[in-house]
Amino acid sequence: MMYSFIARNKINTFLILFVFILACGGFGLLAGRFLGMSFFLFILLLAAGYACVQYFFSGRLAVLMSGARKISRNDNPRLWNTVENLSITTGLPMPEVYIVDDPAPNAFATGRDPKHAKVAATSGLLEILDDSELEGVMAHEMGHVKNYDIRVSTIVFGLVSAVGLISDMVLRALIWGDNRREGNSAFSFAIVLFFSLLAPIAAMLVQLAVSREREYLADATGALTTRYPAALASALAKLEGNARPLQRQSSSMAHLWISNPMPRGFFRKLFSTHPPTEERIRRLKEMGNQF
């Protein structure tokens, strides 16, 4: 059951990415009609370069934006030993361990691959969770590392950036350029305008969908590592019950945290990078029946 869930989640992510890439290519070719293919290729290269910078420096940026401080075993033996035991269990390299001095209970993982991984927990999380719950949360974060989720999110980020740049350039060309050249009928003009307005919104929704799928996958991977899904389910319930905004908020890294760090409200639900906590807990309890 658990292995089939993990396999299904990976397939879902692949299908979303595959359709997204095809859609981006189609939109790009349509945009090339107005921008010219050389300019279109320039925008793609620019977006790819931006994504590469994010890929190689995302770990450092996340640490800086969160205000996390690197620790050793002596600084917090409980957190360090938990991560070390999970590293041994999963066969992954020992990641750098950080603590964020913030009363909001939360945790995140970052790094482009297991060799460059970083995991962090807030002081608030360490205060409210017992040892088994802490292990469940950190197993979830190590699951992100094991599943190369930072790499997946970087690919999606690059595609979203490309769509945004292309859309912006197309809209500028439609508004200020001469679009009455041969072949650019009023109908094609309207079609390109429609997709230029719609594409960034659709791209963002795809990004959110991928993020939610990866959260489910990390939950399942973490549960499989500890063989105790109930601990992670209990931790998620505590995180939801004690949720509060982080002192240093950044929407650009909201998807990294195990629990949505943004303030509650209608738009948080609509554009959430995380699936509903109730559904995550339900799935974990269902997995628990397999042990």
From Swiss-Prot:
Localization terms from the record: Cell membrane
Cofactor: record remark: Binds 1 zinc ion per subunit.
Keywords: Cell membrane, Hydrolase, Membrane, Metal-binding, Metalloprotease, Protease, Transmembrane, Transmembrane helix, Zinc
Domain of life of the source: Bacteria
Short name of any one Pfam family annotated for the protein: Peptidase_M48
Annotated InterPro entries: HtpX_protease, Pept_M48_protease_HtpX, Peptidase_M48
Catalytic residues (UniProt): E141
CDD domains registered for this protein in UniProt: M48B_Htpx_like
UniProt membrane topology term: Multi-pass membrane protein
Cellular component, GO, one term: plasma membrane
Cofactor(s) this protein cannot do without: Zn(2+)
Regions that span the bilayer: 11-31, 34-54, 155-175, 186-206
E.C. designation(s): 3.4.24.-
An annotated GO BP: proteolysis
Gene3D superfamilies in alphabetical order: Metalloproteases ('zincins'), catalytic domain
Amino acids binding Zn(2+): H140, H144, E215
Molecular functions per Gene Ontology: metalloendopeptidase activity; zinc ion binding
The family this protein is said to belong to: Belongs to the peptidase M48B family.
HAMAP family, A to Z: Pept_M48_protease_HtpX (MF_00188)
PANTHER family: PROTEASE HTPX (PTHR43221:SF1)
Designated name of the protein: Protease HtpX homolog
Source organism (scientific name): Tropheryma whipplei (strain TW08/27) (Whipple's bacillus)
Gene: htpX
